[in-house]
């Protein structure tokens, strides 16, 4: 009887957590739709970053978001991508943060420059990006 009650409670908690996760993901999709509607592939980095700054969105840059998704992208000549943080989720015990970003992935326009970014880099895609940070 106790085992059955514990099982019912565990299953109920699992379904509640799944429902909350689905609600969070729906909110992320709304934010993504806004950015993707305003910022189209092919726009240059200068236009994208001006839009973000004008709309008060703080962003940071990170190399090669695609590599974190399991897609291989050569680091040689790779451009940096812009990330706008939209949420924080519970982190597993071995990480200090579990952040959710809108990722703006760019194709670098020019190769071999010293700069990591170029205002003429072309926007390749806009997507949701989850990143565990501060992990052991």
Residue ranges and their predicted role:
Residues 1-14:
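Hydrophobic membrane-insertion alpha-helices, especially the h-region
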Residues 12-136:
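Residues within mature, well-folded domains
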